[in-house]
C-alpha cells in the first residue's frame, strides 16, 4: 500500500517543496508508519510507500483540510 502522509488532527497532507528524494518525507513516513516504509515528495506532498494494509493515508473520512 502507498499514499499521502496525513495529519490525523487536521486531515491535511504533509507539504514538501523539494520533489523526488526528500529527507523530510522519508523521516516523517518512517516515524508514522515504521522503519520498513519509504517516502518521497510527489506533487508537493509527502508520498509514503511500503505501508501495511491498515495504514491511514489521505484523505481522511469526515476530515477536510482547512
Swiss-Prot record:
Q: Which family does it belong to?
A: Belongs to the long (4 C-C) scorpion toxin superfamily. Sodium channel inhibitor family. Beta subfamily.
GO biological process: what's one of them? defense response
Gene Ontology annotations for the cellular component aspect, listed alphabetically: extracellular space
Q: Report the protein name in the record.
A: Beta-mammal toxin Css2
Where in the numbering of this chain does the LCN-type CS-alpha/beta domain appear? 1-66
Q: Which UniProt keywords apply?
A: Amidation, Disulfide bond, Ion channel impairing toxin, Neurotoxin, Secreted, Toxin, Voltage-gated sodium channel impairing toxin
Q: What is known of its domains?
A: Has the structural arrangement of an alpha-helix connected to antiparallel beta-sheets by disulfide bonds (CS-alpha/beta).
Q: Does the keyword Transmembrane apply?
A: no
| Additional facts recorded | Is the most abundant and deadly toxin from the venom of C.s.suffusus.
Q: Which residues form a coiled coil?
A: none
Residues recorded with modification Asparagine amide: 66
Where is it mostly found? secreted
Where expressed (tissue)? Expressed by the venom gland.
The answer to whether the entry has keyword Metal-binding is: no
Disulfide cysteine pairs (residue numbers):
12-65, 16-41, 25-46, 29-48
What's the effect of swapping residue 66 to R?
A: Non-amidated peptide that is less potent than the native peptide
A GO molecular function annotation here is:
toxin activity
Q: How is it modified after translation?
A: C-terminal amidation increases its affinity for sodium channels.
Amino acid at each position: 500500500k502507498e499514499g499521502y502522509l496525513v495529519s490525523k488532527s487536521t486531515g491535511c497532507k504533509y507539504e514538501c517543496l523539494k520533489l523526488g528524494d526528500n529527507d523530510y518525507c522519508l523521516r516523517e513516513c518512517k516515524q508514522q508508519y515504521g522503519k520498513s516504509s519509504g517516502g518521497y515528495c510527489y506533487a508537493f506532498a509527502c508520498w509514503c510507500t511500503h505501508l501495511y494494509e491498515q495504514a491511514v493515508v489521505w484523505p481522511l473520512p469526515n476530515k477536510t483540510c482547512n
